[in-house]
């Protein structure tokens, strides 16, 4: 089943064309990684997919339900009530966590399920405790973000996204703000989600991790998808731009 479908997406910031006719389909249980140099449009594509940025052109649907349609060459968004229901299909983990600093861990996890999804507090708190256990964060329920390491904050952010029971989980460079040791903690969690067949779209600079975990990889540059395929196909590509990009990582 197709969980996410984007067709012919274009996005401009003033005179700068950031996305140039990009299409993306993600199926149930698939892990898709998006790689490429800074400024290639990776994060903008993710923000368009999660309705944080508006597309100038293109359409978008989740599980066959249209969020954005094309009319006369322009994107037309559904009404807010429809978009609100569609947002329930996905979760997003940011590179800088975006936890509420004045909420403790438990409230960061439970606030949206209780007040937005109108779920029962007992059920929500039980789910939160189970997720914190899976994240290796038992005992941190009453801690505030300022009392946690970066790796712990990112694991709380992942747990918070999972609290809403999303069909698709998006990651926008989830380890870019972490040192190598803490990066390993977060990648371990994402790896475990992949083993559970969680549908994920991951923007990342972790090349070895992308190669290991992904069913499919997109290499973007200057607003277009230059190479797309399995990890083996992408990392063995003879495309000169792809080879040059990978060469810079191997030289580090």
Residue ranges and their predicted role:
Residues 144-148, 152:
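Conserved ABC ATPase signature
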Residues 228-229:
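ABC ATPase "signature
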């Amino acid at each position: 089943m197709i969980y996410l479908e984007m067709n012919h997406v274009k996005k401009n910031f003033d005179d700068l064309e950031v996305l140039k006719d990009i299409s993306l389909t993600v199926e149930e249980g698939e892990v898709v990684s998006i790689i490429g140099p800074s400024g290639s449009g990776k994060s903008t594509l993710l923000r368009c997919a999660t309705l944080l940025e508006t597309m100038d052109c293109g359409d978008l649907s989740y599980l066959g339900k249209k969020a954005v349609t094309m009319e006369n060459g322009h994107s037309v968004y559904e009404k807010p009530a429809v978009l609100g229901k569609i947002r329930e299909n996905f979760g997003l983990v940011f590179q800088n966590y975006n936890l509420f600093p004045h909420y403790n861990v438990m409230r960061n996890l439970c606030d949206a399920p209780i007040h937005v999804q109108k779920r029962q507090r007992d059920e929500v708190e039980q789910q939160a405790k189970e997720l914190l256990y899976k994240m290796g964060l038992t005992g941190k329920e009453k801690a505030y973000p300022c009392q946690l390491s970066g790796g712990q904050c990112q694991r709380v952010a992942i747990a918070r996204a999972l609290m809403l029971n999303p069909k698709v989980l998006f990651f926008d460079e989830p380890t870019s703000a972490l040192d190598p040791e803490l990066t390993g903690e977060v990648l371990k969690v994402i790896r475990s989600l992949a083993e559970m067949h969680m549908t994920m779209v991951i923007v990342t600079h972790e090349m070895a991790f992308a190669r290991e975990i992904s069913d499919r990889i997109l290499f973007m540059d200057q607003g277009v998808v230059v190479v797309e395929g399995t990890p083996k196909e992408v990392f063995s590509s003879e495309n000169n731009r792809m080879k040059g990009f990978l060469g810079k990582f191997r030289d580090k």
